[in-house]
Curated annotation (Swiss-Prot):
Database matches in InterPro entries: DUF3798
Pfam families: DUF3798
Protein's recorded name: Uncharacterized protein TP_0014
Highest taxon above the source species: Bacteria
Length: 202
C-alpha cells in the first residue's frame, strides 16, 4: 500500500477548491489508477470530490450518508431517519454500478460524539456510571445514539512523541461499504510497528 498526499492551494477558497477538484480528479485517477482509494480531510470539499469520483468510477472512504446522498442525487428530508436515506443511497449505487467503491460512516461521528459525551458526563454527575473503564463507558454511551453501529474506544498515542495521552482517546466505528458489507474496523488490532511512526510539526 502506498500513500499519496494531494493538497488544494490554500488561497483557492471554497469555490476555487471545488473547481480545482473538478479539473484534477480525472488526472489523479489517470496517474494513480481506478483502484486508488481517496480520503478527504475537509468536510467542505467531500461532496464535490465524491461527485467527480461517481462520474469517473473512482473510490472514496470516510464519507457520511448525507455526503453520498448529495453526490448521487438522492433527495431527503432534514428530519428523515438515516436508515431510510441509506436504503435509497444503496439503490442508487447499485443502479450506477458502483457497488463496493464507497465506504461510509453510517452514524455521524460529530452527532454521536456530542450526544455520547454528554450522556457520559450525565452518568458521572448523577452517579450512574456502571463501567470503571472510561473506554468501555464511552463506547456504551456512544452506542445509545447510533443504531446498528459498533464503536471502539482505544488509547490515544501522540504521533510526535510516541507516548500515550491519558486524557485523550481514539474512537473507531465500523465502515459500511455501499452495496456490499461492513468492514469490522472495531475488531482490528492496531499493529505496534505503526506506533513508532513519527510526524514532525509542519
Amino acid at each position: 500500500m502506498r500513500l499519496r498526499r494531494l493538497q488544494i492551494p490554500q488561497e483557492s477558497g471554497v469555490e476555487g477548491a471545488r473547481a480545482f477538484i473538478g479539473t484534477h480528479t480525472k488526472q489523479w485517477i489517470g496517474k494513480y489508477g481506478k483502484n486508488t482509494m481517496f480520503f478527504c480531510t475537509n468536510d467542505t470539499h467531500r461532496v464535490s470530490l465524491m461527485r467527480e469520483l461517481v462520474s469517473k468510477d473512482g473510490m472514496l472512504l470516510g464519507a457520511n450518508v448525507f455526503d453520498c446522498a448529495e453526490a448521487l442525487g438522492v433527495e431527503y428530508a432534514d428530519d428523515e431517519d438515516v436508515s431510510g436515506i441509506l436504503e435509497r443511497v444503496e439503490s442508487a449505487v447499485e443502479e450506477k454500478r458502483l457497488v463496493g467503491r464507497f465506504g461510509v460512516n453510517v452514524s455521524s461521528h460529530i452527532f454521536v460524539s456530542t450526544l455520547g459525551l454528554t450522556e457520559y458526563a450525565r452518568r458521572i454527575l448523577q452517579n450512574e456510571l456502571r463501567e470503571k473503564d472510561m473506554r468501555v463507558a464511552l463506547s456504551d454511551a456512544f452506542s445509545l445514539f447510533s443504531k446498528g453501529t459498533r464503536w471502539r474506544v482505544a488509547p490515544y498515542t501522540d504521533l510526535l512523541t510516541g507516548k500515550e495521552v491519558s486524557n485523550h482517546v481514539s474512537v473507531f466505528s465500523d465502515i459500511h461499504i455501499l452495496g456490499k458489507f461492513s468492514l469490522p474496523v472495531t475488531d482490528q488490532e492496531f499493529p505496534e510497528k505503526y506506533r513508532s511512526i513519527r510526524f514532525g510539526r509542519q
